[in-house]
Swiss-Prot record:
<dbReference type="Pfam" id="PF01171">
    <property type="entry name" value="ATP_bind_3"/>
</dbReference>
<dbReference type="InterPro" id="IPR014729">
    <property type="entry name" value="Rossmann-like_a/b/a_fold"/>
</dbReference>
<comment type="function">
    <text>Ligates lysine onto the cytidine present at position 34 of the AUA codon-specific tRNA(Ile) that contains the anticodon CAU, in an ATP-dependent manner. Cytidine is converted to lysidine, thus changing the amino acid specificity of the tRNA from methionine to isoleucine.</text>
</comment>
<keyword id="KW-0819">tRNA processing</keyword>
<keyword id="KW-0436">Ligase</keyword>
<protein>
    <recommendedName>
        <fullName>tRNA(Ile)-lysidine synthase</fullName>
        <ecNumber>6.3.4.19</ecNumber>
    </recommendedName>
</protein>
<feature type="binding site">
    <location>
        <begin position="27"/>
        <end position="32"/>
    </location>
    <ligand>
        <name>ATP</name>
    </ligand>
</feature>
<dbReference type="GO" id="GO:0006400">
    <property type="term" value="P:tRNA modification"/>
</dbReference>
<comment type="similarity">
    <text>Belongs to the tRNA(Ile)-lysidine synthase family.</text>
</comment>
<dbReference type="InterPro" id="IPR012094">
    <property type="entry name" value="tRNA_Ile_lys_synt"/>
</dbReference>
<dbReference type="InterPro" id="IPR012795">
    <property type="entry name" value="tRNA_Ile_lys_synt_N"/>
</dbReference>
<dbReference type="GO" id="GO:0032267">
    <property type="term" value="F:tRNA(Ile)-lysidine synthase activity"/>
</dbReference>
<keyword id="KW-0547">Nucleotide-binding</keyword>
<dbReference type="GO" id="GO:0005524">
    <property type="term" value="F:ATP binding"/>
</dbReference>
<dbReference type="InterPro" id="IPR011063">
    <property type="entry name" value="TilS/TtcA_N"/>
</dbReference>
<keyword id="KW-0963">Cytoplasm</keyword>
<keyword id="KW-0067">ATP-binding</keyword>
Amino acid sequence: MLYEKFEYNINNLIGNFGLSKIAIAVSGGSDSISLLYLANIWARKNNIELFVISVDHNLRPQSKQENYYIHTISSNLNRKYYNLSFDHQNNFSNLQERAREGRYDLMTNLCLELDVLVLLTAHHEDDYVENFCLRLERNSGIFGLSSSNIHWYNNIQIIRPLYNIPKSELVEYLVNHKIKWFEDESNLSDKYRRNIIRQKLFKEENYIKAEISLQQLKTNKLIEDELKPALISAIAEAVKIFEYGFTFLDLVKFDKFLNEVKAQIINFLLIMISGQSRSARFYSIAHILKLISQDINFKNTVHGCVIKRIQNELLIYREFGKKLPKSKILLDKSVIWDNRFCITKNQKTPDCVITYLSLADYKAIKKQLDLKHLKNLSCKNHNAILFTLPIIKILEKVIAIPHISYYDNDVWNFEVSFAPNFVSRFTHFC
């Protein structure tokens, strides 16, 4: 019964991809161990190569045992196993979010190396119920309350084939087949809000969880049938994103869309322009929407961005000064800087540093800069935007600002593209 439900789910989610290989994320818990055995049956049946991936966050002594166990199972199933390691650098602030992002970075980068297009994860029905309650508690908008069984990360499709299967069925499957799993001790800690919600739900009658699941399904249907198509149309019609890392929003076209769609567009733009991975707070977005509705010019800072209304357009560019991006050494052919720009050098260029323009640097080369094009595009906000662009240095000397075609000689050649690591459950931006 369980396998038939899983098989129906995964075939519907993958569709006619014609895959020859697939990857699966396994942690050692009952959810992912069940998924591993179910996916193994399905992969053999469909002649698909299955890669098993685990990530050690180096936070619990038990993780070594878990990884060894996953390795053993993978070997017994004749599947290739990859154990990746997340370096927390002894920085424990905002650790859950950083660990999640680091985990997905590691796994999807490996998928790209293996030429794998799809990664399976073990999110099950109980996880969806918990997420809905968490987001409801945080006053999330309707897009935030929705869930998805498919999303993209680093151009890899993440699929959750256990979405409608409760944890109890997965545990029952393992018990019946005498398969061992590990319990993560941190799941019992009251330190995390999710665990408190999980404990409360455990004490409730099953019909309560069923009602939450029903509300989740209704929300998802509304998003899929009405709001998601409107969101895609709104982005296509009202948004212009420039290679300099700023955007203009046409407020006349923007005004015709529902408030839920408007809020999500503002959120998307703030994530992309700021280079951050997390969403902006809903109350911050609501404040911006209120300012827009007043039909007056304004300037505000939200989520690491400057938002400026100029008549019927909204300009958004990165805020600079409070949190400056780290310098990066360009050793290889290309590097991502500020989570927003991809800089590529030619083979003749020696190792150099990618950083931001300081006031001293600006004063030294000011007379040599041609900012006319940027000035016209940005409605005379060129000076502020200039300081958000990547510059290239060798031995503390500015040798290039590729965006404005500034080079101190004819030898250097760099290509720069605006390529934020933007992740969305509703639209896929490469």
